[in-house]
Every structure is written in C-alpha cells, then in structure tokens.
Regions:
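Short, surface-exposed linear segments at secondary-structure transitions and domain or protein termini
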Residues: 26, 30-32, 71-79, 259-262
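Fe-S ferredoxin-like electron-transfer domains
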Residues: 51-228, 232-236, 241
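Generic start-of-chain signal for non-secretory N-termini
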Residues: 1-23
Length: 552
C-alpha cells in the first residue's frame, strides 16, 4: 500500500497538517476547530444534505461543504465569518420551518443537536407566516417511534441501518420537499430492533419506546459499565435516576462512544438491563429451614456455608466437594474462587460452563509471538477468515467491525459455516459445509485432500474447496476467527495452517468472560495461566499444599 503523504492547510489562520485526502471536517476536528453538521457522521457515506458545514475555501466560487471536500496542500479555509454564519443561520431557519416547538416534552430535549445549533446560529424570530406541518406520530416497532415534523432529513438513520447494520429497514419515500423517512414495510419496521437509528438521530424524530417520557436527561446520572451479554465487552452507559425505592435504570445507550465498541451498541447492550430490578431477582441470601428456603442475613449465610463445607471436607475429603464457577464473573472473582477451592477445600473439582477450548488454544500458541489479534483489528485487517460461529447473533460488535472494514477498506472476508449466516453478504468467498465438519475443513486447509470427501455438498464442491484454500494461502496479514465448533487437535491444526502464512488468530468465547474463566484456572486440570494442576511446584511454594489429582 502506497504511503499517504501529509499536507498542510490553513484554517482560520491556523496551520493544520493531516494526511492527503482527509475530509476537511475531520481535519478541522482534529485540531479543535468545530464545523457544525447534522448529516455528516464518521464511517457513513457522505450525504451533504444539511448544508450546515458550509465554509469558505479560497479560490472557490461559492461556499463548500466541509463534509465532502478532501484537503489538498496549500488550501486556505475560513470556517467563521459573517458570510458563513449567515449561511448557517439560513439553514437553521429552513430546518425550523416545520419543526415543532415541543422541546419541553420531547425526549431529545437537552440532548438535541438542533437545539444546540439554534442557540449558536439560529435567529430569535422566524420570517415564516405559514402554519407548520402537523402529522401524527407513528409507532414502527415496540421500541421505535417516529415523529415526522421533527425529522430534518439528515438520513443518518437510513445510512446506519443499511450501511452499518446491513438491515436496510429504512428508506426515503417521495422526492424533494415531500421526502420522508419510512420503514421497509407499510407501517412497521422489520429489523433487529438494535436502536442504532434512535441513537444516531440528531433530533427527537426517532425515540425509544423503552425510554419515552420517563425522565429528562439532566435528571439522570450516567454510569459507564461493561455489557455482560456476550464476549465482545462493549461499553454501555446506564441512565440512572433516583426514585422512591432507590435508584432506577431508565436507559441504556452509548453516549460517550469511547469504549471498545466505538459508535456501536446492539439490542442487548441497549435494552437488556431490566433483569437488574426484576421481581424474581434474589436480593437476600436464603437458607433452608424445615424444608423451605427463607431469607437470612449475610453473616448467618456465610457462617452456615463455611461450617457445612468444613464438615464435609473433614469427614469425606476435599474430593467429595465440587465447585462451579461462572463465565460471567470477573477475573478477580474467578481467580479467588479457584484458589479457595484448591487451598481451603482441597479439591481440583472446579469447572465452569465451557464452550470454547481456550486451553488448547493457549497450548497451540505456546512460543509464538504476536500471534493473536483483537476485535478492533478486524476494522482494518485486509483479509479475514471466519470458521464457525454466527457473529451477528453471538458477537454483534465483531460483525459490525467486519462490515465496517468491508465497506470502508474493501477487506476480503472468507467464511466457512454450516449455516447461511448474515455475514455471507459481505463474503468474498463462502463455503457452507456440513454441520460438525469444521475440523475436517481445517485438515483440508493443511493439505489433506482426502478430507474434502466429508465437506463436499451442493454448496461446497470439490473445486470450490480447492479455490477457497488457494485464495487463503495468497492472503497477507490474514486474521483467522473461529468459534467454539473447533476444539483440541483441530485448533492446533488451524494454528499450524495460519502460522504458515503469517496469520493472527481470534478465538471466540460464547459468554461475557469465557476467556477469563479459563485464564484464571476455573478448570479441573489447569491452574491460572494454563499450568498443569498436577506435579507443579511454583504454585505450591506460594499457596502451600495443593491437591495433586486432576479434578472431575
């Protein structure tokens, strides 16, 4: 890839240096110069619909849209002048022509970009004498409501639904001043209900059925946390409001966009927080008395459990006790649990719900440097191989990153799966192999042509298999992503294949901390760091006597 040279431009008398081809609006943002916009959104196609980003560029006959102009060396730009401010003021006046003045009851009030722009650039009075357009609010789905008069036709929602989510549930009907955002069905959305269209809307045209009329933004405390619904580890921000019963979670969003997920948040991260206050949630420990579980204090519960575990250990031995950990708890909690099991209870009978085989993955990578990739790497990797798993359902952020990479960088994506997964639409090459034959595919990639007999089908001919293998062998900087369908020797074979062509690897866990649970030693035969639970000395020197038999 040819190296991109830096160029220097002048913006409002200030020297700005950025790579050639950078959009002017981004070059300005990088040095703290604000250029307002509604329709522009990083990563989405350029629209130039709102005209709020108009700037004066020397030698240009008229004002230019900063969201579409790429910088060139020596360019001289003015972003603040009487001419520019008047143009922005006129745009605001046009947008407000039919926009209802219902800010006091609009859910976007206090977070509305149009409010902010009007405060900075808008006129105090309108010259329009005609009445505003009034239309009934529409409910497109359980979570998406549309208020047409509030819509400023920035098309962000249409683009993020189509380009970002690859759902294409929204479009534009009619033409010119009659244009209106509309769903892909007559009166309802047929989509994933991810809420990205609501999140990206700069005004209150799209609002959430889960949040409507519950509170005002300034009444909430915004608490950043990590979503626990899958292994992606997305940051989500919970809007928390004080109530008579304590603190209520009223909204989930991605307001600061500084987590690993950037702009993205799926339906689970955005809406699936009601379990926190569910009526069936245990809020106090229970102890069984006379055959019934009754509430008790934490002190009594801990004392009772400790006493019974000690009695069982002393009378029957540590091996009579089994400990089940969780792949949804933190590394610290998992580490302490397995240490408690081994050093206090004297048992290696500790495990968790295992799907992905991270132990085999660790063994296969032993001695290899820089062999693993991250989810963020999938945004820029030139080539990606996906074996098994359905990221759209199981790892939505990973799917979002792959789609973004294909759209912006034209990355090549090779997929082998037993199902017709949604990411197939982004695939350069796709093999639909029989279910449970992922290991045979890896053997074939390693040159075992006889394995092709177990893989061929109407959707994967022998020639297609060979072409798939040859295409992969020719890829540079390949990232191989595989799901829990591969285990043991199959993972070792995949690492052998990938290492031969300089690939990096990502092993996908099915739960929030599947990898951490394995790393921390929630395994019957391995200690933290995948050290054998038998015959080792280092941990015994630190922890004292440890059980030497493998757990169940």
């Amino acid at each position: 890839m040819a190296e991109v040279k830096n160029v220097t431009i002048t913006v409002d008398g200030k020297q700005v240096t950025a790579p050639a081809g950078t959009l002017l609006i981004e070059a300005c943002k990088a040095v703290g110069i604000e250029v307002p916009s509604f329709c522009y959104y990083p990563g989405l196609s350029l629209q130039a619909a709102c005209r709020m980003c108009l700037v004066r560029i020397e030698k240009m006959p008229k004002l230019q849209t900063a969201c579409t102009v790429q910088i060139t060396d020596g360019m001289v730009v003015t972003t603040e002048s009487d001419e520019v401010r008047q143009a922005r003021k006129s745009m605001i006046e046009l947008l407000l022509g039919n926009h209802p003045l219902d800010c006091p009851v609009c859910d976007a009030g206090g977070e509305c970009e149009l409010q902010d722009m009007t405060f900075k650039y808008g006129a105090a009075e309108s010259r329009y004498m005609e009445g505003k357009l009034h239309k009934e609010e529409q409910q497109w789905s359980p979570v998406v409501f549309f208020d047409r008069p509030r819509c400023i036709l920035c098309y962000r929602c249409v683009r993020v639904c189509g380009e970002g989510m690859d759902v294409w549930a929204l479009g534009v009907q009619n033409r010119g001043s009659g244009s209106v955002i509309a769903p892909n069905r007559d009166d309802h959305l047929e989509c994933e209900e991810c809420g990205m269209c609501i999140d990206i809307c700069p005004v209150g045209a799209l609002t959430s059925g889960a949040y409507r009329y519950k509170t005002r933004p300034w009444e909430m405390k915004h608490v950043g946390t990590i979503c626990t619904h899958c292994g992606d580890g997305c940051k989500t921000t919970l809007g928390v409001r004080r109530s008579d019963t304590g603190m209520d979670i009223v909204r989930g969003d991605n307001r600061d966009k500084n987590g690993i997920n950037g702009d993205f948040l799926c339906i689970k991260g955005r809406y699936a927080f009601d379990f926190f206050e569910h009526k069936d949630r245990l809020r106090r420990p229970l102890i069984r008395r006379n055959g019934k579980l009754v509430p008790t204090t934490w002190e009594e519960a801990v004392e009772h459990v400790g006493k019974r575990l000690k009695e069982i250990r002393d009378s029957r031995g540590g091996r009579s006790i089994g400990v089940i950990g969780s792949n949804r708890t933190t590394n610290e909690e998992n580490y302490l649990l397995q240490k408690f099991a081994r050093t206090v209870l004297g048992t290696n009978n500790i495990d968790h719900h295992r799907t992905a085989d991270f132990a085999s993955f660790a063994r296969a990578l032993a001695g290899k440097q820089n062999a693993t990739a991250t989810t963020r790497d999938l945004i820029s990797a030139p080539a990606i191989l996906l074996i098994g798993n359905d990221p759209t359902e199981q790892h939505p952020l990973l799917a979002w990153n792959i789609r973004t990479n294909v759209r912006l960088n034209r990355a090549k994506v090779f997929i082998a799966n037993s199902a017709d997964i949604k990411l197939r639409r982004q695939a350069t090459a796709y093999l639909q192999i029989p279910e449970g034959r992922e290991g045979k595919l890896v053997a074939f990639l390693n040159g075992e042509d006889a394995a092709a007999g177990s893989l061929t089908s109407a959707n994967a001919s022998n020639d297609a298999l060979k072409q798939f293998r040859e295409q992969l062998r020719g890829q540079q900087d390949l990232v191989i992503v595989f799901g829990s369908e591969l285990r043991g020797a199959d993972i070792t074979a995949l690492v052998k294949f990938g290492s031969g062509i300089g690939a990096k690897f990502i092993s996908l866990g099915d739960y929030a901390n599947s990898r951490g649970a394995a790393d921390m030693g929630l395994l019957p035969d391995l200690l933290p760091g995948y050290v054998s639970a038998t015959g080792q000395q280092k941990f015994s020197q630190e922890w004292g006597s440890l059980p030497q038999d493998k757990g169940l």
